[in-house]
Amino acid sequence: MTNLNYQQTHFVMSAPDIRHLPSDCGIEVAFAGRSNAGKSSALNTLTNQKSLARTSKTPGRTQLINLFEVVDGKRLVDLPGYGYAEVPEEMKRKWQRALGEYLEKRQSLQGLVVLMDIRHPLKDLDQQMIQWAVESNIQVLVLLTKADKLASGARKAQLNMVREAVLAFNGDVQVEAFSSLKKQGVDKLRQKLDSWFSELAPVEEIQDGE
């Protein structure tokens, strides 16, 4: 398994939907989460760059699919944040269509990182994202972000509760606590990404099994 240098990650492009993404080849790992789940902070912490992914004081501002390249043919995909109350209903539906379309149709997608505030995990849309991924045979890493906001005992209790809950999806779903502030869980995230990026995209296997 190759240990990739995530500090080399650089921005490639933004796209309004899957049709505007570059060719569907190589390996992609997508990051998804509610608009206030700390997705941008996690990407910046992973890559040790302060402003790779722009953090916004206004949740719901990031409406585009943002692509970052780690090395040639290996990309991180920052999906639009979802579930923010003040976003108009039509825009919410548009985002959800874009997210669903990407998860179901993108052949180069190898893994999905779903970020949730450890204090408010497994909201309806979080569960929908995991369900979509499992149904598409995509491995999932759930990061319970802002873990530094809870004392050690409460943090472990939340982690165990979510680990128990995701068993119901009957898929490959791993759960870890994460804190951008304290750099907690960053090594686990890098290890998971390294393993995903080391795998061959499973396109042929899917076609052979049909």
Curated annotation (Swiss-Prot):
<dbReference type="Pfam" id="PF01926">
    <property type="entry name" value="MMR_HSR1"/>
</dbReference>
<dbReference type="InterPro" id="IPR030393">
    <property type="entry name" value="G_ENGB_dom"/>
</dbReference>
<comment type="function">
    <text>Necessary for normal cell division and for the maintenance of normal septation.</text>
</comment>
<keyword id="KW-0717">Septation</keyword>
<dbReference type="InterPro" id="IPR006073">
    <property type="entry name" value="GTP-bd"/>
</dbReference>
<feature type="binding site">
    <location>
        <position position="40"/>
    </location>
    <ligand>
        <name>Mg(2+)</name>
    </ligand>
</feature>
<dbReference type="GO" id="GO:0046872">
    <property type="term" value="F:metal ion binding"/>
</dbReference>
<keyword id="KW-0131">Cell cycle</keyword>
<keyword id="KW-0132">Cell division</keyword>
<dbReference type="InterPro" id="IPR027417">
    <property type="entry name" value="P-loop_NTPase"/>
</dbReference>
<feature type="binding site">
    <location>
        <begin position="60"/>
        <end position="64"/>
    </location>
    <ligand>
        <name>GTP</name>
    </ligand>
</feature>
<feature type="binding site">
    <location>
        <begin position="178"/>
        <end position="180"/>
    </location>
    <ligand>
        <name>GTP</name>
    </ligand>
</feature>
<comment type="similarity">
    <text>Belongs to the TRAFAC class TrmE-Era-EngA-EngB-Septin-like GTPase superfamily. EngB GTPase family.</text>
</comment>
<feature type="binding site">
    <location>
        <begin position="33"/>
        <end position="40"/>
    </location>
    <ligand>
        <name>GTP</name>
    </ligand>
</feature>
<keyword id="KW-0342">GTP-binding</keyword>
<feature type="binding site">
    <location>
        <begin position="145"/>
        <end position="148"/>
    </location>
    <ligand>
        <name>GTP</name>
    </ligand>
</feature>
<keyword id="KW-0547">Nucleotide-binding</keyword>
<dbReference type="GO" id="GO:0000917">
    <property type="term" value="P:division septum assembly"/>
</dbReference>
<dbReference type="InterPro" id="IPR019987">
    <property type="entry name" value="GTP-bd_ribosome_bio_YsxC"/>
</dbReference>
<dbReference type="GO" id="GO:0005525">
    <property type="term" value="F:GTP binding"/>
</dbReference>
<dbReference type="GO" id="GO:0005829">
    <property type="term" value="C:cytosol"/>
</dbReference>
<feature type="binding site">
    <location>
        <position position="62"/>
    </location>
    <ligand>
        <name>Mg(2+)</name>
    </ligand>
</feature>
<feature type="domain" description="EngB-type G">
    <location>
        <begin position="25"/>
        <end position="199"/>
    </location>
</feature>
<protein>
    <recommendedName>
        <fullName>Probable GTP-binding protein EngB</fullName>
    </recommendedName>
</protein>
<keyword id="KW-0460">Magnesium</keyword>
<keyword id="KW-0479">Metal-binding</keyword>
<feature type="binding site">
    <location>
        <begin position="78"/>
        <end position="81"/>
    </location>
    <ligand>
        <name>GTP</name>
    </ligand>
</feature>
